[in-house]
Amino acid sequence: MRHRRRTPHLNKPADQRKALMRALTTALLREGRITTTKARAKAIRATTEKMITLAKDGSLAARRQALAYIYDKELVRSLFEQAPERYRDRPGGYTRILRTVRRRGDGAEMAVIELV
């Protein structure tokens, strides 16, 4: 049952929210470290960890699932090459969220999310 298993809405319609999540996940996997709001960082943590777990699996089905979510085909290829040896001994927890100073314009809580 999925009762009370809500996804963070991030004050956006569903299509914009999905596009934002995909874009932030792609940016994090490409750059290794991004600065965003604390709520967005917490929201993309699960999808980023799922993509890395798929890369550790390395099967064709896992690669196709990752390609369906991540925008960049070359990024998926490099992720599937590097993730198995980089995260071999780590069963999860591939990201770290560090809180930073509030944003000057609106006072939003900011955070840095990075790959461990």
Swiss-Prot record:
One of its GO terms (biological process) is translation. Keywords: Ribonucleoprotein, Ribosomal protein. Transmembrane segments: none annotated. GO terms for molecular function: structural constituent of ribosome. GO terms for cellular component: cytosolic large ribosomal subunit. It holds the Pfam family Ribosomal_L17. Disulfide bonds: none annotated. PROSITE patterns: RIBOSOMAL_L17. Belongs to the bacterial ribosomal protein bL17 family. NCBIfam families: L17. Part of the 50S ribosomal subunit. Contacts protein L32. HAMAP family: Ribosomal_bL17. This is Large ribosomal subunit protein bL17.
